[in-house]
Design a protein with these regions (language model features):
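Short hydrophobic/Thr-rich beta-strand motif most characteristic of the beta2 strand and flanking loop
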Residues: 59-65, 73, 133
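Receiver (REC) domain active-site loop signature in two-component systems and cognate sites
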Residues: 88
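Charged docking surfaces used in two-component/phosphorelay signaling
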Residues: 49-56
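C-terminal catalytic ATP-binding subdomain
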Residues: 1-28
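Conserved acidic carboxylate
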Residues: 42
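Active-site beta3 strand of CheY-like receiver
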Residues: 77-83
Length: 151
């Protein structure tokens, strides 16, 4: 019998969604240190909710609503992976990716976009993204991308 604690909202720069403790038949397994952090840079709340539901409760999700917040949250929380929407207000995902790459070459960044042309994919990869998932995002495509980076 598994129970998962519901997420809590917090954070000034964006919002953090935590799923941190699992109970299994009398044994409590505290997974706070093992849970991977995923920064989701997405300006549309319904898209974030969809991603949250597709990803499930095995991760701590950080929500940035634009590229500027994504950079600040990256610096503050050092996520294990970033899902980066390309078209966002204030600063787009490609520019945010380029700036984040000046801090880290290692963190995997997966571009999320409705633009599915090969030139869009090439530009995202050129700007520092490691992978590319087109919207609408399917559970299979997202799982495949996360598995690629062992997240």
């Amino acid at each position: 019998l598994l129970h998962t604690i519901p997420y809590e909202e917090a954070g000034e720069l964006g919002e953090i969604f935590k799923m941190s403790k699992t109970e299994s038949k009398g044994n409590t397994v505290n997974r706070v240190q093992q849970i991977k952090k995923i920064l989701v840079a997405e300006d549309v709340e319904s898209n974030f909710i969809l991603l949250k539901n597709l990803i499930g409760r095995e991760y701590t999700l950080l929500w940035a609503k634009d590229g500027v917040e994504a950079i600040e949250m990256y610096k503050q929380y050092q996520p294990d992976l970033i899902l980066m929407d390309i078209k966002m207000p204030r600063m787009d995902g490609l520019e945010a990716t380029h700036i984040i790459r000046s801090y880290s070459k290692e963190v995997p960044i997966i571009a999320l976009t409705a633009y599915a042309f090969e030139t869009d994919k090439e530009l995202a990869l050129e700007m520092g993204c490691n992978d590319f998932v087109t919207k609408p995002v399917s559970k299979e495509a997202l799982e495949k991308a996360l598995e690629k980076f062992s997240v």
